[in-house]
């Protein structure tokens, strides 16, 4: 029963750290948006906002999340995909998207849709993506590219790293209590 209670406490602490991290990432993103977001001609009907780019500095995985709001009617939109030209560029290297073909998003007029694009193995020490190209289109063969320039990355640790950190801390705490 004691072990179960400790596990529960650990999980609660990990969740607490996770929510703190998520708040910090959001706060950082609010103050650090890409310097420029250029969209293709037909995307004048869209608004792109709330760009959040967070990386995990243990694995080098970077998640780019943003909201895309169609100003008029609803439709389906193909988004992302390595084979369609979605990639991030930093310090002369290209990092293709994790998806081969991307995903289909169902857009509703006036409602923001969260879009998530993952990039893997981004080299350590890169704190800004020079350019991110995200392909989008009404069909797989009519793709346009959204280009974001100077996208700041907020580096954080994975949940696993947070859990390990919490676990080590609690182990140290137990060791100290035993000495008293």
What are these regions (language model features)?
Residues 12, 17-18, 22-39, 76-89, ...:
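Surface-exposed edge beta-strand/loop patches
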Residues 48-51, 69, 99-102:
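N-terminal post-signal-peptidase region of extra-cytosolic proteins
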Residues 50-63, 104-109:
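Short, solvent-exposed beta-strand/turn "edge" segments of beta-rich domains on protein surfaces
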């Amino acid at each position: 029963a004691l072990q179960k209670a400790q596990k529960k406490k650990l999980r609660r602490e990990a969740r607490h750290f996770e929510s703190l991290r998520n708040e910090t990432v959001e706060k950082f993103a609010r103050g650090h948006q890409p310097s420029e977001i250029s969209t293709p001609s037909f995307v004048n009907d869209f608004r792109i906002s709330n760009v959040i780019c967070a990386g995990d500095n243990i694995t080098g995985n970077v998640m780019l999340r943003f909201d895309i709001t169609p100003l008029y009617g609803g439709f389906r939109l193909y988004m992302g995909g390595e084979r369609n030209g979605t990639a991030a560029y930093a310090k002369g290297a290209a990092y293709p998207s994790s998806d081969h073909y991307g995903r289909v998003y169902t857009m509703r007029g006036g409602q923001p849709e969260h879009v998530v694009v993952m990039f893997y193995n981004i080299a350590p020490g890169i704190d800004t993506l020079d350019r991110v190209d995200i392909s989008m289109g009404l069909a797989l063969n009519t793709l346009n590219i959204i280009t974001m320039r100077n996208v700041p990355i907020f580096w954080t640790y994975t949940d696993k790293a947070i859990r390990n950190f919490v676990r080590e801390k609690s182990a140290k705490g137990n060791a100290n209590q035993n000495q008293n």
